[in-house]
Amino acid sequence: MYNGILPVYKERGLTSHDVVFKLRKILKTKKIGHTGTLDPEVAGVLPVCIGNATRVSDYVMDMGKAYEANVSIGRSTTTEDQTGDTLEMKGVHSADFNNDDIDRLLENFKGVIEQIPPMYSSVKVNGKKLYEYARNNETVERPKRKVNIKDIGRISELDFKENECHFKIRVICGKGTYIRTLATDIGVKLGFPAHMSKLTRIESGGFVLKDSLTLEQIKELHEQDSLQNKLFPLEYGLKGLPSIKIKDSHIKKRILNGQKFNKNEFDNKIKDQIVFIDDDSEKVLAIYMVHPTKESEIKPKKVFN
């Protein structure tokens, strides 16, 4: 039985569910879950939690992500990416803007911004996914959402051809960010229709492309009984949370028994969640959270016996 986090390279054409389904067949275990959906046409890093690591999948999902995207100015689509039907076209020429104009414009997207999610997305409105409305040719008001763009920058020269302009950007962002919406919004700021023509996720939850394995590589390693060496411990998925190492055996026992504590037994500055780690084994003991009605106390959220 495997336990740990496995960074998978999701190839284009597969859904995130396809990856999980195939892994369950390869590894012969059902206890597998991914940490955030990647659209079928998007390639890149998809961290997958296996065995007891499935208990930390939400925390991996909350950690930052990084993407490289191709932005195409001059044509918009129904899906905001290259898979959709054309909505609008407007010729773009090199006299319209240059590298410096794009660089200045991208600065405006840094920080917390508002996005309207695409109609072809899994965001729910009134209990129904937006893409279900879109497929039925129904219109519905889409709620604005705040997302965090930690960094964004151009990583290629502008390429003007056939009345369009193409360039690549790198984006570091929080969860819930739609890069294709970012591409269309860049076009709006320039005064042109636009779409995202290609997307690769280069980092997710602290895992990068070079650490990621294809399904074929995973199958080979499993057959060679050497896959466990490629798995990251579940503790890796909690590195985004503050932690305290516990030495006292009596306190360790109380933690593993799920007892409540006063903050002042550890740190009065605990604001939200805290991870307790065994000082001897470096293994996580539990995740605690501030008590919802007693701010001076912390209570267990997840205990790892």
UniProtKB/Swiss-Prot annotation:
Entry's Gene Ontology BP terms: mRNA pseudouridine synthesis; tRNA pseudouridine synthesis
Alphabetical UniProt keywords: Isomerase, tRNA processing
Residues the record marks as active site: D39
NCBIfam families in UniProt: TruB
EC id: 5.4.99.25
Catalytic reactions of this protein: uridine(55) in tRNA = pseudouridine(55) in tRNA
Pfam families assigned to the protein according to its UniProt record, in alphabetical order: TruB_C_2, TruB_N
Top-rank lineage group of the source organism: Bacteria
Residue pairs linked by disulfide bridges in the UniProt entry: none
Entry function: Responsible for synthesis of pseudouridine from uracil-55 in the psi GC loop of transfer RNAs.
Record keyword tRNA processing present: yes
Coiled coil, from the record: none
Matching InterPro entries: PsdUridine_synth_cat_dom_sf, PsdUridine_synth_N, tRNA_psdUridine_synth_TruB, TruB_C
Name of this chain's protein: tRNA pseudouridine synthase B
Molecular function GO labels: RNA binding; tRNA pseudouridine(55) synthase activity
Taxon lineage: Bacteria, Bacillati, Bacillota, Bacilli, Bacillales
The family this protein is said to belong to: Belongs to the pseudouridine synthase TruB family. Type 1 subfamily.
HAMAP family hit by this protein: TruB_bact
